[in-house]
């Protein structure tokens, strides 16, 4: 489409919805192909990727304004013959989307959260395509139960019809979870299928978010000041998790596996230990995430970095508009 627009003399812009570090990684791939080759599967997982080198001084909090990550944008722009980059984030829907059939589920979830103490609930949700097989669900359930902490857990099952189809809600939870689990955790936990993620993250009862690290989920969590425990599943989620944990210090690692094709279970003991650590520790990450929440909100108001970038984009668009002459 860009080629067509160019032939017609119409200005065109690419809307990239991921983060700047991953964008820099993709720009680096041609160089890597020329120097190293295309193999990634057997590559040392600690291989240096230029866009994931944090150029800021040690201990400095990155001025991350959602889709504007300071040093990452500097890398992307440095010495490269590419058009200007307009960092206009946040690009998230703070109202969320609720289909008519989900209203009852949403009301039940929010009512349950209203009854919980502040910052007492760990929220587990893995996006519209995140799902787990039954053995992993059982391990997760046991880990949550043994932790003794409150939880809200969105359980989705892989589609049986098509590998590309979205996961489905479980019809009978008792068949896929440990015997007696639902009864034993009735007082401290709630299991749902679909969950209104934006509204849940905004609720005062949520203390931590166990996430697949889709970029939208990261943005929503940072916006609401909820720290993340990473459990990436597919696509660029591994690199998102790496960036949040190792590069920015804005999340903690529940699971990151940098080798492709790893289907190893996260066992109950690991989950129990992780949840206890999250909920019982005085986390420096939580403090940093709260600060980032404030910075991200400042970025989108008048005078903020994203607000200014959007203004520059509009100016560039208007400068390139050609008004046809009247006949």
Each predicted region: which residue ranges?
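Nucleotide-sugar-dependent glycosyltransferase catalytic domains
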Residues: 1-204, 208, 213, 222-224, ...
């Amino acid at each position: 489409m860009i080629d067509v627009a160019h032939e017609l003399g119409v200005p065109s812009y690419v809307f990239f919805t991921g983060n700047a570090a991953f964008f820099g990684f993709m720009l680096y791939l041609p160089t890597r192909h020329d120097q190293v080759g295309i193999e990634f599967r057997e590559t040392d997982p600690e291989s240096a990727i230029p866009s994931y080198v944090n150029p800021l001084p040690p201990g400095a909090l990155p001025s991350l304004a959602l889709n504007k990550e300071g040093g990452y944008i500097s890398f992307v722009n440095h010495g490269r013959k590419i058009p200007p980059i307009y960092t206009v984030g946040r690009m998230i829907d703070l109202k969320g989307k609720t289909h008519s059939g989900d209203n009852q589920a949403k009301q039940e979830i929010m009512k349950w959260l209203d009854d919980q103490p502040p910052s007492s609930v760990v929220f587990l949700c893995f996006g519209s395509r995140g799902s787990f097989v039954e053995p992993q669900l059982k391990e997760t359930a046991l880990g949550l139960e043994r932790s003794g902490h409150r939880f809200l857990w969105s359980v989705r099952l892989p589609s049986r019809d098509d590998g590309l189809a979205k996961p489905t809600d479980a019809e009978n939870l008792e068949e896929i979870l440990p015997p007696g689990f639902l009864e034993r955790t009735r007082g401290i936990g709630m299991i749902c299928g679909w969950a209104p993620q934006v509204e849940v993250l905004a609720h005062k009862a949520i203390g931590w978010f166990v996430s697949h690290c889709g970029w939208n989920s990261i943005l929503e969590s940072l916006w609401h000041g909820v720290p993340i425990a990473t459990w990436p599943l597919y696509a660029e989620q591994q690199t998102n998790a790496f960036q949040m944990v190792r590069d920015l210090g804005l999340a903690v690692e529940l699971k990151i596996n940098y080798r492709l094709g790893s289907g190893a279970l996260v066992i109950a003991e690991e989950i129990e230990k992780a949840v206890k650590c999250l909920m019982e520790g005085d986390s420096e990450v939580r403090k940093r995430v709260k600060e980032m929440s404030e910075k991200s909100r400042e970025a989108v108001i008048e005078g903020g970095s994203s607000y200014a970038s959007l203004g520059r984009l509009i100016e560039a668009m208007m400068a390139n508009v050609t008004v046809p002459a009247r006949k």
